[in-house]
Amino acid sequence: MGDVSELKMQITPETPGRIPVLNPFESPSDYSNLHEQTLASPSIFKSTKLPTPGKFRWSIDQLAIINPVEIDPEEIHRQASYLRLSRIDKDVEDKRQKAIEEFFTKDVIVPSPWTDHDGKQPSELHPSKCLSSHDDSPDGKKPSLPSQKCNAACQTLLSLPVDFNLEAILGDYFREEDFVAHTPGNLSSSSLRRKLFLDGNGSICDPLPSPSPGSPPCSARGSLEGQFSSSPIQNSVKKYSLGSVTTSPSAISSPTFSPIALQGGKTPLSEPRKLTFHSPEASCATASTGIVNPSIRSPYIDGCSPIKNWSPRRLRGGPQCLSSLVRIPFTLEAHSEDEEADVSCTGAAPLSTNACGEPRVVTAMSVTQSHSGIAEKERAVLDDAESERENDTVDMVDPTDTVAESTWIKEPVDDGNSPMTDSASGIAFSIENSHMCMSPLAESSVLPYESSAIQMNSDYNTQTCVSNITDIVGTERYCKENVTHTNVPVPFEVEMKSQVNNVTPGHTAQRCWMKSPRPSQCSRP
């Protein structure tokens, strides 16, 4: 350390007033490193030998300047005349070109078909000549034909005219469209999740029509017969498919039901409500054990759910044992539990509103209890409720989101009506002259009525009205209140009336009025 301090003290300051000379390659901090040892490259003092240059030669330009050469103009003229005469000589040029052609026309190189070789005209070879010579041979053996060559215009085996109809000749032997249409793999991969325009047998059309200008295409006729088909049912008298109807609804006397789970449109303020129609066995079992039969709770069947045709007959006497359940969950508007606890109705109470005064609307079908004394009041309240449910729609969504669901019960009867019965309360819904086809699949559902249908696709949350007359199944907001179960059955009647529905402009729907000889008590479940 002492040596370093001594070296720093020996640095003399610069003379004041003199312009300091600064080395741009040095920094002010280099002074502190002068005492350190400098490491030089090992080859810094190594002598390098330069390569010995070769023999020196002057360039052409330098030689022309140093020693110019005199050229005789006569020699220049002589060389020019020689070159000119050699170019004009055609005989020599022809000999050269002939030698070139002979070289390229030998067997080593393939000759061009457009050129004549050895001055011989090649004969043309046609398939017809070969066939005729084969037929004319007496012993039936193929005659040995001499090796012949064809020119460039005859190198095809078959020539067809411009207006030749190849499909008319080969169309009966191969039809690619029919082969692709009947392949099971192509049926499953032809669309996202459904096959379009299929009948009950799974084919595009029952007969395969011959292509003719007057006959419409199969897809056009299939679109007129029904809606989209997801899983057609085979080996049935009437061709039904889940989500499509291939026959006229007017020709069907009894409505057809299948297990289905409908779900109302969800909004951020919506919450599920229950609308339950109990059967004697199901209500007793649920009340005693609190556990619902899994076969009743789950309407979904693996694969394809068959659609059963129920022979209708009218109810007689008291409650009867019910054979099947149809669950229709509804999601109604959101209200607080305090408001729901205060709502109770007697007599005309099913038409009453909540504390806010807004009727709860699910669809355009209204199920009401009318008496001779209060029928006019109930209809007046319904007319007021129509103005408030103009913007209310029901969209089908994925049924797995539904927590609280409702059950509808059906039972075969004798006549042309298909009632859905509440055996505990004796309520019978009798819907006449209407055809209802409900699909259990979540992909699509069709509710046709009088040659009209409405399709709701749950995958994309869309709703499509197909015609002007739709059959919409639902209930008003007051349907969240269940009818009090009594031991005395009360007969009810459902009357179908056609009124204007505000779901889609210009479309009509069916309103269901429920009449009873006396009002019944309603309360929250």
Curated annotation (Swiss-Prot):
Residues 115-142 have a biased composition (Basic and acidic residues). The gene is Bora. The keyword Cell cycle applies. PANTHER family: PROTEIN AURORA BOREALIS (PTHR14728:SF2). Residues 114-146, 505-525 are annotated as: Disordered. Phosphorylated by AURKA. The modification Phosphothreonine is found at residue 331. Keywords: Cell cycle, Cell division, Methylation, Mitosis, Phosphoprotein. Belongs to the BORA family. It comes from Mus musculus. One of its GO terms (molecular function) is protein kinase binding. This is Protein aurora borealis.
